[in-house]
Structure formats: structure tokens, C-alpha cells
């Protein structure tokens, strides 16, 4: 048996223990995990500093460095997030259907854990803690395979979380961190359909394509966020600028940050100069079509690649469009089914935008940055699914369970 298969088998065995834990036991476990992160803060931050030094040596971009970096505040927020997850309602055992059939059988549909989930991700060490906590809260075993750029941070975080499992008299193999960064090891992991029930890739386009093409296990992709804001002719200009500033500048490396601004031609002469002036203090580089460049001479002429790009940086592509339909056509061509925003005072245009787009999250007069599990009331998320399956959009605890039927009778037969 190969090493990676052995680890997956251990995780599957441990997952059976997790599946039977009471809600209270899981709450105490996650609180202990949060305390372990606080206790190991110095070790985790030192490991992260080493990862950052290595990343700078390799001259990685500022967006990657931002996703990779931890500081005392971010680490404290990670621990607090685990406490928040501990306090969430337990989805396991929830009855979603309860029906007494005419023949007397009692039919229930009940949430149960998926089993073992493999999370393959890049850069963000907070995902190590968040994904582990969410999967464990839902009664699942978790196999984590982070990126090489965060390997030291991930080892330090996983070590703290595994210690909490031991303190709870649970097998630490309920949480496996794959430390072999070789591509062939990840490829082998993706073949283990008898031991792993779901793979969730979260990272760059290359990683997600590799996982989708090679996995023999069901995959829920967390694809790039090419998010748009369309400013309709009837939009409140002050509101549109406020949403633009929030969506583009508060955390440009986030997947729910805006990448493209679409502007109705009737409002463009009034809106775009004001928007450009509002963005200037934040250092946002603008790239626009010919019509935009006519209104804003300092703007760089955009290419097709600009409209398809997930910049994760202070860069914004702009296009002026004649109507809502043209905005929808642009989004269908260049978007990634993540999050789209319309700013409008026209209810009919808002309804058209919502009904004709199939993106995971559609906002009407609200910031793209609300495309987040916590902001949408899920409490926490393992990521934002762009795969049109049962889990679409921010994935909370419910999405890490499945529903099965439990039927009780008194000897009834079908025929």
C-alpha cells in the first residue's frame, strides 16, 4: 500500500468516529482547536514568516503575498472563526423531509456526513483551519493538500489542530495534511475513489483544471472570480461609486473582488469621470475599451485578455455597453459564474439581470464583497462553488453533508 493510500485509509477509518460524535462533543473539539491555535501562535507566525521569506525570494506577486501572510490579528481571527463554527447549528441529523405515506411507512430525509473530503488549495493558510473545522463540524474526515508556498504554515497549523484531536481522545488521522508536494502524489490522491468522497479544489485556474481533468472522485470546483459590476442608466451615481470602491479596493486579492466594470452608455459621461477620480487615491489602474478611453484619456486600452482576467490586484477593466442585454452578453462571454452586481433603480432591469444570469451569486444594489458565507448568513464557508451542483455559491455546513432516506414500517411490502 502506498503512503498516500495509507493516509487516506486512516482518514476514512477516523471519519467513522467523527460521524457519530454528538453536537456537544464537536463543539468542545472545535473550541479546543481554537485554543490550540492561540497557544501555538508564536510557532505558526514563525513558520509563516519563513514561508513569506521564501516567497519573496521567488519574487511572487503582491496578491499571492497577501493571501499567504499571517499576522497576530489574522491568526486571532482564524481562532475566532473556529469558535464561530463551533457555535453553528449542527447539520448532521437534521430532518429535511418527514412524511407518513398512505401505506403506513414513515419516510424521513436526514442529513448525514459525506465521509472523507479532500481539499486541494493554494497560498491561503487560513483555509487549513477553516476547512478542517467545517468538515469536522459536519462529521467528515478531511485530507488537506495546500500549496508548497504555505507548507511551513500549514504544518504548524495542522499540528496544533491534530493535538486538539488527541486531547479529545479522537484519532488525529481525522485530519491529514499531505506534506509531499510532488505532483504525482496529488495525482494519486485524486484516484482514490474508494476512500475519498469529494474533492474541492480552490486556487488558480491551472490547479483547478488539473484536478477536474484527473480526478476519479466527484469534484466541486471553486473557480476564479471574474466578478462584474454593471452600472445601469438609472443608477444612483453615488451608490455605484460606493459599491465600486468597496468591491475593488477593500481586498483586491479576494475572489469576490470586482474585476470588470460595465457602464451603460447613457450614464457613462457622468459616471466614469467621477468613478475614476474616486479610484485614483487607491492606485487602481484602469483598462478600458475605445469609448472609455475617449472619456478617460489616461486609461490603457483593454484587450480581450483583460476582460477574462482575474487580476486579484488593483486593476480594473471597463467597458461601455448600450443596454442590459449587452452587459449580460459580456458577462456570459467573460465571466466565471462567480458573482455579478447590477446597480439600478429600474426593477425590470434588475429582474432581467437576476433571471438571465446563472452565476452563483447575483447582487442588486449591493457590493460583490457580500459574496461570502459569513455575510450571507451561512456562518462560515469552505469556499465558493462555481460548479452547478447541489452546492452552488458559498458552501456552508449543509453543503458538506448529504441527505439520505430513512424509512420505518411495520412489515409493509410493495406488492
Swiss-Prot record:
Q: Does the keyword Amino-acid biosynthesis apply?
A: yes
> Which enzyme class, named as a word?
oxidoreductase
Q: Which domain of life is it from?
A: Bacteria
**CDD domains recorded:** ALDH_F18-19_ProA-GPR
Question: Gene behind this chain?
Answer: proA
Q: What are the BP-aspect GO terms?
A: L-proline biosynthetic process
Question: Reaction catalysed by this chain?
Answer: L-glutamate 5-semialdehyde + phosphate + NADP(+) = L-glutamyl 5-phosphate + NADPH + H(+)
The protein's Enzyme Commission number? 1.2.1.41
Stated name of the protein: Gamma-glutamyl phosphate reductase
Q: Which GO terms describe its cellular component?
A: cytoplasm
What keywords are annotated for this sequence in UniProt? Amino-acid biosynthesis, Cytoplasm, NADP, Oxidoreductase, Proline biosynthesis
Instruction: Tell me the route in metabolism or biology where this protein functions.
Output: Amino-acid biosynthesis; L-proline biosynthesis; L-glutamate 5-semialdehyde from L-glutamate: step 2/2
**PROSITE patterns for this protein:** PROA (PS01223)
Pfam families per the record? Aldedh (PF00171)
Q: State which residue ranges cross the membrane.
A: none
So what does this one do?
Catalyzes the NADPH-dependent reduction of L-glutamate 5-phosphate into L-glutamate 5-semialdehyde and phosphate. The product spontaneously undergoes cyclization to form 1-pyrroline-5-carboxylate.
Q: Which GO terms describe its molecular function?
A: glutamate-5-semialdehyde dehydrogenase activity; NADP binding
- Which cellular compartments is it found in? Cytoplasm
Q: Which InterPro entries match?
A: Ald_DH/histidinol_DH, Ald_DH_C, Ald_DH_N, Aldehyde_DH_dom, G-glutamylP_reductase_CS, Glu-5-SA_DH, GPR_dom
Which family does this protein fall into?
Belongs to the gamma-glutamyl phosphate reductase family.
Amino acid at each position: 500500500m502506498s503512503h498516500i493510500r495509507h493516509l487516506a485509509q486512516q482518514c476514512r477509518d477516523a471519519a467513522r468516529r467523527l460521524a457519530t460524535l454528538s453536537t456537544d462533543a464537536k463543539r468542545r473539539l472545535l473550541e479546543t482547536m481554537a485554543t490550540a491555535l492561540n497557544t501555538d501562535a508564536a510557532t505558526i507566525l514563525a513558520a509563516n514568516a519563513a514561508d513569506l521569506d521564501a516567497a519573496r525570494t521567488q519574487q511572487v506577486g503582491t496578491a499571492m503575498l497577501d493571501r499567504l501572510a499571517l499576522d497576530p490579528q489574522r491568526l486571532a481571527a482564524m481562532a475566532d472563526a473556529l469558535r464561530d463554527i463551533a457555535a453553528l447549528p449542527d447539520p448532521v441529523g437534521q430532518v429535511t423531509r418527514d412524511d407518513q405515506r398512505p401505506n403506513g411507512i414513515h419516510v424521513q430525509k436526514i442529513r448525514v456526513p459525506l465521509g472523507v473530503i479532500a481539499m486541494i488549495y493554494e497560498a491561503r493558510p487560513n483555509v487549513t483551519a477553516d476547512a478542517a473545522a467545517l468538515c469536522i463540524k459536519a462529521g467528515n474526515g478531511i485530507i488537506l493538500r495546500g500549496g508548497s508556498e504555505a507548507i511551513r504554515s500549514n504544518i504548524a497549523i495542522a499540528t496544533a489542530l491534530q493535538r486538539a484531536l488527541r486531547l479529545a481522545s479522537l484519532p488525529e488521522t481525522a485530519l491529514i495534511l499531505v506534506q509531499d508536494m510532488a505532483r504525482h502524489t496529488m495525482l494519486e490522491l485524486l484516484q482514490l475513489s474508494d476512500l475519498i468522497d469529494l474533492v474541492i479544489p480552490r486556487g488558480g485556474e491551472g490547479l483547478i483544471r488539473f484536478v477536474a481533468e484527473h480526478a476519479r472522485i466527484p469534484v466541486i470546483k471553486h473557480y476564479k472570480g471574474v466578478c462584474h459590476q454593471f452600472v445601469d442608466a438609472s443608477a444612483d451615481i453615488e451608490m455605484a461609486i460606493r459599491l465600486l470602491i468597496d468591491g475593488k479596493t477593500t481586498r483586491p486579492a479576494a475572489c469576490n473582488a470586482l474585476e470588470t466594470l460595465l457602464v451603460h452608455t447613457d450614464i457613462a459621461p457622468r459616471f466614469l469621470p467621477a468613478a475614476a477620480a474616486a479610484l485614483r487615491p487607491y492606485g487602481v489602474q484602469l483598462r478600458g475599451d475605445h469609448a472609455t478611453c475617449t472619456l478617460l484619456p489616461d486609461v490603457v486600452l483593454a484587450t480581450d485578455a483583460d476582460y477574462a482576467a482575474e487580476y486579484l490586484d488593483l486593476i480594473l477593466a471597463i467597458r461601455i455597453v448600450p443596454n442590459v442585454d449587452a452587459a449580460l452578453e459580456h458577462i456570459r462571454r467573460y465571466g466565471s459564474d462567480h458573482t455579478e452586481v447590477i446597480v439600478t433603480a429600474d426593477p425590470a432591469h434588475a429582474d432581467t439581470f437576476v433571471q438571465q444570469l446563472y452565476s452563483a451569486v447575483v447582487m442588486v444594489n449591493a457590493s460583490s464583497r457580500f459574496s461570502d458565507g459569513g455575510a450571507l448568513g451561512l456562518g462560515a464557508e469552505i469556499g465558493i462553488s462555481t460548479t452547478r451542483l447541489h452546492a452552488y455559491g458559498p458552501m456552508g455546513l449543509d453543503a458538506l453533508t448529504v441527505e439520505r432516506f430513512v424509512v420505518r414500517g411495520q412489515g409493509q411490502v410493495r406488492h
